[in-house]
């Protein structure tokens, strides 16, 4: 908890208290019966007569005393004017000092209304209640309200009698508490140290140039979320990562979107949102100071936003980056001579999948002496897509080896070439840069033909075993549909999971 900016905040509240005392004194002078014990619960005849005879004195605008610390940083990020800051302080005061509840109850002439109303806030800022310049700072599109820093309640009431409330998360932030909003648990998280990612130079340059919308197309093993987070960090922003699927499924979706934007503004952060399948809440999360990085597997849909994004593909991580991720996650638990990147080179894993696979390998190794072996690594890697595939195909755990095959030597040689191609494709395509044009050539395809019982499935099982992979068989009857489009979708789901 950082409390270094509290003295400045308390000094600003003290200045507000002096203005409130002046307002209370002026109110008591004009009140025909200031000591009435039922004041605020009814209006006497004398009070009505005094109200009818009252005249408004000329308003004296407040003198801004500057901003510093967290209040100043928030004003800069949220693009608050000096009037916005003063309105925020007026609304904030009862949450920091309980005496302000009584002050506001008195000035509101209602002991049950212990927060500042819009009218009272404007008066304390030295503005007429009818001043458009002041009222506009409290409408839904204003910087304070749009960023979720101030809530104007009681919408059914006349504007001047609507209560102003500062959300607890904003109060806590200004008091030095950096914990994220509890409402975002399971939906969003703050990323302090993004995982190793691909080159982010182009994205960083765009963010520093003022681009506020980025779309990353997720490729297998690419790690779009980590790419976006790394770019934001290098561009000087914090990172709030949002699970778009969970956000979309929450019943209070709209309020959570506001909470995400507020968290990003408080932290001076950007938002990483994905994976998206349909139109994301770009307008609700839009803010001139908050970069928004959206990612998904589909191409960007121009109908999602009137502002075009900076587009980039999140391609698979280079071998060196994957190796560094494995080493960072496993530390000194690896068995001697084991290269995790080589052992899992034929698995297409992104940064998050590598992190989960490394953790799974470490857990499995605990019952085998605590040393992580190649078998542990491959089992952890296999587990990253097993759940999704088993819903679409039948899993076979290989239990045979090359010596179990009874085939002509030439056929066995071809099978071993096929296995070698799958094993070393990462080195050939990534390290040696032998990828064909158009992004083709990553997959390995084999066509086995022969009568029943000649060893087609067994050969596939042997290849899978040599690579440390599981084998999945697909029943075409569950895939082929009378509509060609549905058949294509079924096949795409299988290969995407694989």
Model-derived regions: residue spans:
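AAA+ P-loop ATPase motor domain of ring mechanoenzymes
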Residues: 42-77, 103-113, 158-240, 244-249, ...
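Short helix-coil junctions and helix-kink-helix linkers
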Residues: 108-109, 120-133
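A short, conserved structural fragment
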Residues: 145-156
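Extended, charge-enriched "interface" segments that sit outside catalytic cores
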Residues: 1-62
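Short, hydrophobic-biased segments on the C-terminal half of alpha helices
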Residues: 141-142
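Conserved nucleotide-sensing/catalytic segment adjacent to the nucleotide-binding pocket
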Residues: 256-286, 496-498
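Structural motif
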Residues: 74-84, 132-133
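Short, hydrophobic/amphipathic alpha-helical patches that form generic packing surfaces
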Residues: 11, 83-96, 146, 230, ...
């Amino acid at each position: 908890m950082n409390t270094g900016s509290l003295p400045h905040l308390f000094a600003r509240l003290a200045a507000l208290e002096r203005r409130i005392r002046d307002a209370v004194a002026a109110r008591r002078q004009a009140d025909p019966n200031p000591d009435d014990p039922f004041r605020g619960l009814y209006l006497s005849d004398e009070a009505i007569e005094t109200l009818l005879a009252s005249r408004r004195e000329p308003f004296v605008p407040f003198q801004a005393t500057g901003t510093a610390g967290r209040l100043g940083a928030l004003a800069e990020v949220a693009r608050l004017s000096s009037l916005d800051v003063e309105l925020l302080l007026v609304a904030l005061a009862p949450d920091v000092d309980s005496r302000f509840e009584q002050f506001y109850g008195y000035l509101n002439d209602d002991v049950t209304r212990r927060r500042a109303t819009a009218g009272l806030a404007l008066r304390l800022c030295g503005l007429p209640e009818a001043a458009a310049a002041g009222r506009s700072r409290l409408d839904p599109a204003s910087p304070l309200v749009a960023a979720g820093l101030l809530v104007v309640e009681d919408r059914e009431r006349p504007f001047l009698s609507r209560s102003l409330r500062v959300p607890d998360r904003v109060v806590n932030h200004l008091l030095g508490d950096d914990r994220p909003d509890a409402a975002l648990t399971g939906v969003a998280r703050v990323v302090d140290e993004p995982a190793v990612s691909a080159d982010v130079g182009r994205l960083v340059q765009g963010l520093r140039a003022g681009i506020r919308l980025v779309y990353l197309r997720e490729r297998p093993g690419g790690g779009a979320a980590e790419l976006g987070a790394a770019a934001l960090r290098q561009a000087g922003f914090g990172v709030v990562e949002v699970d778009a699927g969970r956000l979309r499924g929450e019943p209070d979706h709209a309020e959570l979107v506001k909470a995400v934007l507020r968290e990003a503004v408080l932290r001076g952060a950007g938002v990483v949102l994905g994976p998206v399948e349909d139109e994301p809440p770009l307008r609700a999360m839009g803010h001139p100071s908050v970069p928004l990085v959206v990612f998904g597997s589909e191409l960007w849909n121009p109908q999602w936003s009137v502002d075009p994004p900076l587009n980039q593909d999140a391609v698979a991580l280079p071998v060196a980056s994957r190796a560094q991720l494995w080493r960072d996650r496993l530390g000194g638990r690896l068995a001697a001579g084991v290269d995790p990147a080589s052992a899992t080179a034929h698995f297409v894993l992104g940064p998050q999948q590598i992190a989960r696979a490394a953790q799974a390998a470490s857990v499995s190794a605990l019952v085998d002496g605590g040393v992580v072996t190649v078998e542990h690594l491959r089992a952890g890697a296999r587990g990253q897509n097993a759940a999704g595939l088993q819903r679409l195909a039948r899993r076979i755990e290989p239990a045979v080896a090359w010596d179990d095959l009874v085939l002509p030597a030439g056929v066995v040689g071809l099978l071993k070439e096929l296995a070698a191609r799958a094993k070393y494709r990462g080195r050939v395509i990534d390290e040696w840069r032998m990828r064909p044009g158009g992004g083709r050539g990553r997959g390995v395809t084999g066509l086995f033909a022969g009568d029943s019982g000649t060893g087609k499935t067994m050969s596939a099982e042997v290849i899978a075993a040599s690579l440390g992979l599981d084998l999945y068989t697909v029943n075409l009857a569950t895939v082929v549909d009378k509509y060609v489009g549905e058949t294509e979708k079924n096949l795409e789901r299988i290969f995407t999971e694989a």
